[in-house]
Amino acid sequence: MTKVITRFAPSPTGMLHVGNIRVALLNWLYAKKHNGKFILRFDDTDLERSKQKYKNDIERDLKFLNINWDQTFNQLSRVSRYHEIKNLLINKKRLYACYETKEELELKRKLQLSKGLPPIYDRASLNLTEKQIQKYIEQGRKPHYRFFLSYEPISWFDMIKGEIKYDGKTLSDPIVIRADGSMTYMLCSVIDDIDYDITHIIRGEDHVSNTAIQIQMFEALNKIPPVFAHLSLIINKEEKISKRVGGFEIAYLKKEVGLEAMTIASFFSLLGSSLHIFPYKSIEKLVAQFEISSFSKSPTIYQQYDLERLNHKLLISLDFNEVKERLKEIDADYIDENFWLSVRPNLQKLSDIKDWWDICYQTPKIKNLNLDKEYLKQASKLLPLKITKDSWSIWTKEITNITGRKGKELFLPLRLALTGRESGPEIAGILPLIDREEIIRRLISIA
């Protein structure tokens, strides 16, 4: 049986966003599910926009999500191989030189669209005479190269979308080599997939037409194409997610929103599938439940709120031993198990625990100055002598007996005086963490 080999091929022209991290996760999970191999490839043929900084950022984000690769390479290191295949395809008459300028091509495109025609290249360069070609060369024009597509029907079975068919006549011969000699994504990707024995490619449905073209490239090189799966796109406010839409970068979700790695991994591994989105504690458990057949053909809606809610669910499921290392990472290794268990139910992000530590062990900032001072003074006198886990219940019952207060009128002034916040962890759990004298001091300082 052929070993499964998948790949993730980002362009280092920006930071990873939720759309392409989803592609990375699913390719990695598919490989691991089948005891296969996962390759990280950098499609850096865009010399102007590709940056080493973005390569470093991509690797950092993948490592953060526990996506480890078995092999990595970048396309710029393989230029000689691409030119070898270029010459082979020219000899096979599947690549041909074109001499139109960008302006001429744009004019052709506009004319076709104005007539209600699809913007398909007319193959005019195939009819150039030697004299015309020589004239272009003398003008200083350098050729770009297109792949010659067969007009035969193209079809394949997609692991998500099922049978897909294309009429070759509806596709335009793609430019595979620019006039400056640099290579575009289309052919380079096919050559890499052949040389690295890629067996399965999982990517967004915006690549479906590319797949139709690339299948012909595989066939032109006498190779069997990989198995394809095209994911429905992630939609947010009617927009497709891309690196040009701000706020969706993994670095942003990690640093600004405060999401845990397994929150992001769990969410985007299951988003768009029929499986329940559950906050898994380890990437290995995600591998065990992963099924590519569970993914839907329909567009997938992503909302940041759903991620934040899942992050909360993950945090409240973690035992202290499971979170100790993460506490060290955020410089909160002073947190002990008792404190963790007390505040855990109300954490939206892990760093919130530092705020609650400050609430318990530093004087809170009281924003509401309209508290009933006499009530707080009276409450301070009713505080039990020994503070235990039952003290809050005993204390508030006694306050009710003496003052007649109930509900919000009873609880909110006490919470504000003790924590400076209108909501948060159960005071029953927080109270034993604060020294009795400090509790009285906070009540009296307002009263």
Swiss-Prot record:
One GO BP annotation of this record? glutamyl-tRNA aminoacylation
**Keywords, ordered alphabetically:** Aminoacyl-tRNA synthetase, ATP-binding, Cytoplasm, Ligase, Nucleotide-binding, Protein biosynthesis
Q: Which GO terms describe its molecular function?
A: ATP binding; glutamate-tRNA ligase activity; tRNA binding
Q: What is its EC number?
A: 6.1.1.17
| UniProt-listed SUPFAM superfamilies | An anticodon-binding domain of class I aminoacyl-tRNA synthetases, Nucleotidylyl transferase
Classify the source by domain of life. Bacteria
Listed binding positions for ATP are: K243
Motif 'KMSKS' region: which ranges?
A: 240-244
An annotated GO cellular component: cytoplasm
'HIGH' region (motif): residue ranges:
10-20
Q: Where in the cell is it found?
A: Cytoplasm
Q: Which reaction does it catalyse?
A: tRNA(Glu) + L-glutamate + ATP = L-glutamyl-tRNA(Glu) + AMP + diphosphate
Q: Which InterPro entries match?
A: aa-tRNA-synth_I_cd-bd, aa-tRNA-synth_I_codon-bd_sub2, aa-tRNA-synth_I_CS, aa_tRNA-synth_I_cd-bd_sf, Glu-tRNA-ligase_bac/mito, Glu/Gln-tRNA-synth, Glu/Gln-tRNA-synth_Ib_cat-dom, GluQ/Sye
The Swiss-Prot or TrEMBL record describes its family as follows:
Belongs to the class-I aminoacyl-tRNA synthetase family. Glutamate--tRNA ligase type 1 subfamily.
Record's function text? Catalyzes the attachment of glutamate to tRNA(Glu) in a two-step reaction: glutamate is first activated by ATP to form Glu-AMP and then transferred to the acceptor end of tRNA(Glu).
Q: How does it assemble?
A: Monomer.
Q: What is this protein called?
A: Glutamate--tRNA ligase 1
What's the encoding gene here? Answer: gltX1
